[in-house]
């Protein structure tokens, strides 16, 4: 859903979080870089 913009290592982090907020967090998190 987030698309290819999200780095693979961030996607792996999402799997570890396993929370309903994980997707949104990643969407904003990768922009922090």
Curated annotation (Swiss-Prot):
Domain of life: Eukaryota
GO biological process entries: G protein-coupled receptor signaling pathway; response to food
Primary location class: secreted
Similarity comment: Belongs to the gastrin/cholecystokinin family.
Function statement: Gastrin stimulates the stomach mucosa to produce and secrete hydrochloric acid and the pancreas to secrete its digestive enzymes. It also stimulates smooth muscle contraction and increases blood circulation and water secretion in the stomach and intestine.
Keywords: Amidation, Cleavage on pair of basic residues, Hormone, Pyrrolidone carboxylic acid, Secreted
Protein name stated in the entry: Gastrin
Source organism of the structure: Cavia porcellus
Modified-residue entries (Phenylalanine amide), positions: 33
Coiled coil location: none
UniProt gene name: GAST
GO molecular function per UniProt: hormone activity
Modified residues (Pyrrolidone carboxylic acid): 1
Subcellular location, record wording: Secreted
Any one GO CC term of the record: extracellular space
